[in-house]
Amino acid sequence: MMSRTVRLVLLALACTVDLSQASGFTENGLSLLSYQLCSYPVTRSVQKLQAVQTSHTAYVYCGGWIPWKKCPKTVYRTQYLAMDVPESRNVTDCCAGFEQLGLYCVLSLNRSREFASRPGVCPTAEAEPLSPSCSLDTDCSGLQKCCSWPGGRHCVSPTPTGTEKSMVSWYNVTVLVKVGFEDLQREDPGLRNHTRLLYSLVTSALQPLNPAVHYLTSTGGKDTFTTVSWLLMGFPRLMTVANVSVMLDDMVNRVYEVVSIQVQDVNECLHSELQACSVREQCRNLEGSYQCVSSQRLNHTDEDCPPIRDFVALNVTSSSFHVSWSLNSTQNYNFHIQVYKGKEILRSAWTRGHTMAVSDLEAGVLYRVRTSYLGCGANVSATLVVKTDAQVFQVTIRIMDRNLTEQILDCSSGEFWNFSRQLFHEVQNSFPQAISDLYRQGRLRMQIVSLQAGSLVVTLRLTLQDPDFSVGVHTLTPMLPVLSVSNVFQVDQQRTFVQDWDECAHSSEHDCHPSARCINLEGSYTCQCLTARDASPSRAGRVCEGDMVIPTGDELSVTTKVTVPAASTGITTFGPETLTESLSSKHPRSTPARSQTWTPVPPSVRDGGSIVRQDRNSTGQGQTHGTHQGTTDAPLHTTRESQELITKDPPFLTATTTGYVVWHSSPTWKTPPNSTRLQNEDPRSSSFPGPPSAPTDVTPESPACVPGPIGKVTVSNVTSTSFSLEWPADIRLSPAFHLTLVSPRGPAMTMETQNNNVTLSGLEWGTLYLVEIVAKVCGKEGARTQLKVRTVAQKLAGNVRITSMQYSESFLNTSSREHREFVELFFRTVRDSLPATLRQHMDAGRIRVDIINITNGSIVVEFNLLMTADLDVREVSAGFLNALQNTSMLEVVRGKTFMQDYNECDMKEDDCAPGTCRNTFGSFTCSCDEGGPDSQVEYSGRSCDGDPSGNMTQTPGSEWSPTPAGTRGVPVPIASSTAQDLPLRLNLMDAVSVSCEIETVIITIQKRFLQQAAIPEASLYLGEPSCNVSRSNSTHVFLVAGWGECGTILQSNMTTTVVTTTLRNNLSPEGVIHHPQFLSPIHCAFQNDVLTSSGYTPQWGVYTVIEDLHGTGNFVTEMQLYIGDSPIPQNYSVSASDEIKIEVGLHRQKSSLKVVLTECWATPSSNAKDPVTFSFINNSCPVPNTYTSVIQNGHSSKAQFKLRIFSFINNSIVYLHCKLRVCMENPRNSCRISCNDFRSLRSSEALHQMTWGPLHRTEGAQACTKPVLGTGYIILLAAAALLVVAGATTLLILRYQRVRQKYNLRIQTDDFSYQVFSQ
């Protein structure tokens, strides 16, 4: 009784609330997330009931002695009359100039000059006769316009106008929406509504920038259920790609149908409509813009192109700094200064001076400043790293009543935001008064750096800006007792502490010069040059110059000539400038990113002298109090550790009788304690630091004693542990050649030799080395020559998720006992699970496993797998994957355990320069670019000045045996493009997408991937060779397999239906392998349990592609209502006596799939989880007294039932919802169920929702109809009444006879000796 009362009360409340507002829509059906919504006051006439009293005279008995006498009496009666009353209210509708289109506000169709226009104006010359006809600009291809001519409207190339030239930045915008292109064309011929909807959304999202948006074209997406549209977008001021993308992300969040938006720079130089360079000028494309350079300036090749020097930072404070530079030139250049914070550009300015002030910055943040100018047809630039002043401390808090969960690791979840808000509030309240004052003044910033398990360990970073007093750990320690008695959290006093933040722990935390020592201080740090001179004493350790001598051991003295300037400099040709983030903790490998410097970290010694390489990666920005900065992964403050399963001791030098200098391995070699690694000029091009590539300036000397230049260096005999170098040189002056070898895993090493050839051995395999050679004579140095050489190895990357063990924060410490025990267990388990052949290769040192990272969740291990060139990389990959997935000692998640190719080209671990790197499975190949003969390096076997018809050879695997892996054969010269123009190399993961549909599995493969891997289209098939490519276009090939065809296996249980097939490519008829072979299982999983509501269709499933090409899909349901056999639309009105037939099922019929209804209910709103519900089907059977009858359930892909919905629901509006389960019919499993044995749906199973409705009660029907009895109940009651009457009558007759004693006495004829009394 109480439950029914509560439901009625909630229903009454729901009726009084505006249901449109509760559901996120206006009363006109507009989404409240739409743009261009305005509120208008509206006065409407509303009918209201008013009480009116009327009087009349009635005659009543007067009373008294004459009772029949009547007297007149005035009687008042209250009547309720409906009257029209004006009522004012605010209505939300589209703003002026916009009209409603579906759920959103768009420009009206008569404003086609805005949303369907192209840049430029129509030319004066008449169009060609064969020009296509058109009606709007969008009917034309490319950037053509639709212009009127005497013969009609035709598409022509436009003439630029001042409007387009005023636009500074032009970008291409790619929008992916959830609608099939064929369906879109059918519903919107000409795509007029689609065009104005895109235009309106994009322009509204970018307000108030006033962009120029031009629609280009649309086509179908990678599957049949998406559409890709391209827009051209211009801005009146310079905008970066990152900033535009962030603004358009709001459109993705607001508009459900938009899947993604991608912004790319436009090369204005290719389109005369977008640039204003004259005929005598040459257009040079820049990011977001372009430059016009005079031909005279381009042809002036002898013009001086001096480097930017003395680039330093001055007057650094917590919120500002000055930068200064010099240029040895008589010309007055215009310098472009850009200030970056990570990838985001904060400042962009031009100046003709040599100084620039930068203000309004954050305290304690590392900024990157880039200054550049245009000279001699090149872009000369210099980069400087500056960190603003601040005092930084670390607070570690262990909260015992909270656990680390997936929700709290998701920075976009409500649980994370609630937790961070409570934590910041508790920490703020625990501050001492002086610190609390700084916080209120905005001079203290709190940031969540990491969240770790056990129970929940939070690391906070406190950044203090310009405190008025001395702040140290002792100043913050008083907060701990207050925090430990928090009423919100149970804080562990033993594991909660304050400590200094060590900025010297990683180069991303300080701006010290690579040749300087970072010295950590309490709250801050300082830098000290290790060289002869500090060029900027005002900021010590930022600009170091001169020689640096490192203390040595007994075996080797390493002397390094430090020539790295304070700022990395470079000269690049004109073209798009790509600026990447300075450092990122999400980098997939432990290689340094752009502008990353390596701090001196002495190698850890383990197991009697084996070297464990160690490097740290930066911490990404965590959650900052008061801001919303992206997501935060766990752990937020990661330290990447790289450990080798098989390690080597560092090499040392010995001289041989042949004059060669050979490096050998020695267990007694010791690393110099203060060894310093050098910074490379452009860390993007290398996986390790090194000396700069710019030649050292040499003071002119007399020809009698001037070292000659190093000629072209020839690299030969490259193996996994050695290589040889040889170079021509003028030996008349007996020069000494100074060689420096830099490895990413060890200190820089130097040597001197009188010979012009050297063999380096005892090296690590699969490692990219940087070699610098300089000739010395008379105490003078000649020009330096640099080259990179990679030792031979095949390399893969792997990932495994282990669930049988819990992650521990001690895994971050490589010297901890827990870390060592886990690593030993992991190595031992992997080795023991390998086949005997691979186990022998590993024991012989031909296979090595390097652990790169160990992270939480439960335990995720990232590792690299290196192997010698003669091993079959695919066999090794399959063997390791099988060992990891089937190990008996560790329980792993098979879907999160995989082996994949390590892309040496993307990771810049190749030695192809100046050629182009092309990635292959396990290794890479090199090809020569134009200009290769001018290179100072020649690799034996791939000379760029050789036969131009030479063919590029593949790297070795089981298919290629002539050349060791990592060495390159004769390359293909590429004369038409440069390395910057080449597309990124695809792998199988990126090139293949899986679309899981009902009855069909569709595989889409990019043709570029097939061309890169030299795989013929004709060799591809699904399951069986007959199921080959179904269709293809210019960019993709498609393979389609129906369920039950092409070897497809269909399996189903109570929760999931899984469709499995295999993507293969066959061999050539000759049996010779001409291309890589792959065998990729494909799995499509569908959830059987679905929540279907009248009106919402869930998205089709798709596209998570991992190594073995998994995909997910959804059964798409539909609900249709009928009266009789006629379907009824939404917002239909029915009466209480109308019997509605409802059909629920799958979008497509499949004979083997049956639909079983488990539960159906109605709600007064579109929310299926509304607390007010009216159930009419439960456990697959009708609920009594709901006038519901099931027609069919579990017999086919459709379920049907009838009901009179308003016979038991008093509300005027209802929405219908049903849960259904997909069942596969087979002889052992029948989908037909009875009403007694069907299970209830588990609450944990996946549901999808759509909304139909509403259904309205017919006008004039009673608002609250009393329940009436059905025909069956009436008949039953009548029969019971008759039975009662008959029984009562019989009893009365019997009693009457007994009282009157009326009996019949007769003698029976049978032979009995007694009498029988009968009535």
Curated annotation (Swiss-Prot):
Chief site of localization: membrane
Keyword Membrane set for record: yes
Domain Fibronectin type-III: 307-391, 709-795
S-S bridge residues: C38-C95, C62-C71, C94-C105, C269-C283, C277-C292, C504-C518, C512-C527, C529-C544, C905-C917, C912-C926, C928-C944, C1160-C1218
Comp. bias regions, Polar residues: 664-678, 950-961
Any GO MF annotation of the entry: peptidase inhibitor activity
Chain spans, region Disordered: 569-649, 664-703, 939-966
InterPro entries noted in UniProt: EGF-like_Ca-bd_dom, EGF-like_dom, EGF-type_Asp/Asn_hydroxyl_site, EGF_Ca-bd_CS, Elafin-like_sf, EMI_domain, FN3_dom, FN3_sf
Record topology, Extracellular segments: 23-1273
UniProt feature, compositional bias: Low complexity: 619-632
Keyword Calcium: yes
Keywords, sorted A to Z: Calcium, Cell membrane, Disulfide bond, EGF-like domain, Glycoprotein, Membrane, Repeat, Signal, Transmembrane, Transmembrane helix
Glycan-carrying positions: N90, N110, N172, N193, N243, N315, N717, N757, N951
Signal peptide: 1-22
Domain ZP: 995-1238
UniProt membrane topology term: Single-pass type I membrane protein
EMI domain: residues covered: 34-107
Residue intervals of the SEA domain: 389-503, 792-904
Comp. bias (Basic and acidic residues): 638-647
Localisation: Cell membrane
Cytoplasmic side: 1295-1319
Gene Ontology CC: external side of plasma membrane; extracellular space
WAP domain span: 115-159
Entry protein name: Uromodulin-like 1
Record organism: Mus musculus (Mouse)
